[in-house]
Amino acid sequence: YEELGEVLIPYLKESGYNCVEFLPLSEHPCDESWGYQNTGFFAPTARYGTAEGLQKLVDQMHQNGIYVLLDFVPVHFATDDYGLKRYDGGELYEYPSRDVGVSEWGSCNFMHSRGEVRCFLQSAAYYWMKEFHFDGIRMDAISRIIYWQGDERRGVNGNAVDFIRFMNKGLKERVPNCILAAEDSTNFPGVTAPADQGGLGFDLKWNMGWMHDTLEYFQLDPSARTEAYHKLTFSMMYAYNEHYLLPLSHDEVVHGKATILQKMNGDYERKFPQARAMYAYMMLHPGKKLNFMGNEIGQFREWDEKREQDWNLLDFPIHEAFYHYMKELNHLYLDHPALWEKDFNRDGFIWLDCHQEGRVIYAMQRMAEDQTVIGVFNFSAQPQNGYAVPLQKDGSYRELLNSDWECFGGSKKREELVYENGCVLDLSPFSAVLLVNG
């Protein structure tokens, strides 16, 4: 833990991240579970050091302005005999029925109707925030709590839903500013509504629909994107139903799914401009952002818990330029409140143009009190010259970023153009241009 702080904290600051989420750090017997099958809910894994070392790491991150979240697993636990399974010789923490007692991963499901189980899990979640100063927790597999075995056809598990509401309400009472995030792929309403108003009490919900639509779109041959044009507009139909987070997580870079960069259509050189444009689209889209480690350097090999990332990729100019782009994009995001201040308010976003199916151009606008940022995207394989941005308001607009600048691995010289009387853009293939007012 302590050695990690010496390397990770400077890297996060340089890369433009203000928050880090750790995969589960509760003690677990199997590396291949990534920490999601726990045996020690009150014990930091000894793989990386001592409890004191973890406390020091979190405090050092706070001293450097970095929030720290922890992945927490309230759904199931490992089946090892020295863990919670049949703890007193009977089914104490788990269900007696195998039909609902065994998860799809072969682990034991918690029986959330029992008061003892509820207190155990709520105490464990609070323990990590109280003793280690984590700023919040991301709860895994919430769909498996809402519905029996995560299957909507089997109906809502009322006791488990009551437990989540009860736990979140209690955590907010004890740690009012904590961040509670739900990994949930269901359409169950009110996940981020306050618990005392009938919601589940989370602050954020993973937007799995946005993630699937976006990645599927960029895997398409560019010739098919005209027909699939509205895959990238559909998410705004429900964007304000919950407080969403846009996740490009560990789950999307394992098990044969390919890495984020590899998912982009085309050959090696063609993938990079598409990934740059996609990440710009992500930053302009309402919702908080999550990016898994390695995505920022253009990792080509799927994540393997037994190996570190392929840092030698940065010896290749195209990967170094991609990392330079991701750093600048992250810092740009943090420095412009229009991109995050009104993520959950309808007056913080507007489509300027979402009817350019033939040219595969999109234009959107993000707003804060005194700032406007416009994103214009060409996701076709052809240059789109002479595109007149349909501005809502006349005035001066300055080019913040062009994903096709040479410094990012593109073809255009960095000029940071200023537009005074309308914005007419020459858009490179697979490119994004960001503009700011004033």
List each model region and its residues.
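Active-site rim elements
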Residues: 152-154, 261-270, 310-320, 419-424
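Non-transmembrane alpha-helical segments in soluble domains
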Residues: 9, 58, 125-129, 168, ...
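Active-site His/acidic residue clusters
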Residues: 36-39, 304-313
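C-terminal accessory region downstream of the catalytic core in glycan-modifying enzymes
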Residues: 314, 318-322, 329-331, 388-417
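Conserved, mostly hydrophobic/aromatic
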Residues: 22, 41, 61, 128, ...
